């Protein structure tokens, strides 16, 4: 897998919480812009992380999203999506979790397009 280029993604929200993008931080100390629909969305969030890979500047990093309930209460917790693409012959290693919310789970999958672009989908769901 070519690890250079963009990582586009989508966070699908299947909970009764609202996700709000906070920021993305990389190993180089830079912030990564969250592109697409970055305003709070009930259905989810679309984002793009550019220049990921062993020859890119963002080899490691994480994106944080605040989670609010629908009644406007304070932040309940944070959803974190983290990536690591240190080895050039290995795919990008992705993990995601929600801090302090055992009632919710995050499942992420990474797909590659025909031209080497990658698309990350994370589904946030309540466990019942």
Language-model region placement:
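Intrinsically disordered, low-complexity segments enriched in small/polar residues
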Residues: 1-128
């Amino acid at each position: 897998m070519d690890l250079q280029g963009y990582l586009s993604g989508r966070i699908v929200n299947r909970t009764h919480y609202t996700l709000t993008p906070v920021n993305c931080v990389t190993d180089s100390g830079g912030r990564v812009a969250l592109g697409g629909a970055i305003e709070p969305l009930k259905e989810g969030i679309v984002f793009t992380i550019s220049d990921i890979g062993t020859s890119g500047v963002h080899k490691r990093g994480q994106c944080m999203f605040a989670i609010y309930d629908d009644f406007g209460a304070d932040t309940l917790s944070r959803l974190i999506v983290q990536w690591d693409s240190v080895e050039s012959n290995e795919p990008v290693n992705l993990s995601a979790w929600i801090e302090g919310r055992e009632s919710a789970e995050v499942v992420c999958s990474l797909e590659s397009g025909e031209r080497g672009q990658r698309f990350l989908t994370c589904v946030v769901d309540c466990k019942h």
